[in-house]
């Protein structure tokens, strides 16, 4: 999957995560800001990275703003943002 544009998914509400995806040429880069980063930061990054790799993405910049989201929400938000970012403008308008 190729990331063609910037896209996001999620909210800044409690127990959710906002994932912003941007094209990159430098592999996978994840920037995380989290209310629970000391406790769960590595786990959140691992879920995001596994989701990215599972979708076949090789180059992407991800900014994640976590407000205590559970694993399933992190994965769903990441998948949605990646899918949105992989579509060109002509595909979105359909």
Curated annotation (Swiss-Prot):
Disulfide bonds: none
GO cellular component: cytoplasm
InterPro entries (alphabetical): CitD, Mal_deCO2ase/Cit_lyase_ACP
Modified positions (O-(phosphoribosyl dephospho-coenzyme A)serine) in chain numbering: 14
Alphabetical UniProt keywords: Cytoplasm, Phosphoprotein
Broad class of the protein's primary localization: cytoplasm
Location of this chain's protein in the cell: Cytoplasm
UniProt KW Cytoplasm keyword: yes
Role according to the record: Covalent carrier of the coenzyme of citrate lyase.
Stated family: Belongs to the CitD family.
UniProt subunit comment: Oligomer with a subunit composition of (alpha,beta,gamma)6.
Name the UniProt record assigns to this protein: Citrate lyase acyl carrier protein
